[in-house]
Amino acid sequence: MRVLIVKTSSMGDVLHTLPALTDAQQAIPGIKFDWVVEEGFAQIPSWHAAVERVIPVAIRRWRKAWFSAPIKAERKAFREALQAENYDAVIDAQGLVKSAALVTRLAHGVKHGMDWQTAREPLASLFYNRKHHIAKQQHAVERTRELFAKSLGYSKPQTQGDYAIAQHFLTNLPTDAGEYAVFLHATTRDDKHWPEEHWRELIGLLADSGIRIKLPWGAPHEEERAKRLAEGFAYVEVLPKMSLEGVARVLAGAKFVVSVDTGLSHLTAALDRPNITVYGPTDPGLIGGYGKNQMVCRAPGNELSQLTANAVK
């Protein structure tokens, strides 16, 4: 059986889809998946053993120059790659009109998705041949597991979902695995940042622990923040620029992780590493860290400036 997954973004949403593949793999021996995903997250599906082909899409980039000759050529190549296979099922786990119209609609196969009442954008359900009612008041991982089970005809396991990607990194862990912590200090929204003085206070509290601290970053302003956090602490290392797979490998070897609400926090959960995630204005209830040893630290009054380092430690 060959199935196409449409789950293009974001990082957390893509990661939250992985346990559903593990369920399907256990229920249907030999099942294989192709996966349409935004180019920036294209490494993630390849870490799961059930994924045979990753089809990158670049809707975010294309829409900036949709009708330019280079973008039209890329869109044509994507459509040809998408339509090269006739699928036993196409599962749209995104639930958005944009991805349903630009991706799911074009694929060959019976199209499954959430119904009008439960899709993230109800209009997206108009593009599906089979519409499934998936209750909203459950974690995003469980919603996707239920969607896959109903689409492919098996009972959703009652056990906790298994991302099944940690083993991808076990054969090539960093040489100092288990001897360091990773602090994920960067996120996209200003109100989700934990103040730098609190990060530095937490770093200071670990001075006598014997644990080194590694600080990854993605954008130049994040590198500057990492350098400010590390200043004066010999046991703190600002990492070089890394690919997503490189960051994942560092996370896989961490003794523990402390993070703000960010996609890499979900990656930490997917890698089964102990993680404390600090939350301010966002509610972790239905979209927070899912997995083993995932701890939530809520800020008083949902204001991260009020969350002290001692409360996190």
Region annotations inferred by a language model:
Residues 1-313:
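Catalytic machinery of carbohydrate-active enzymes
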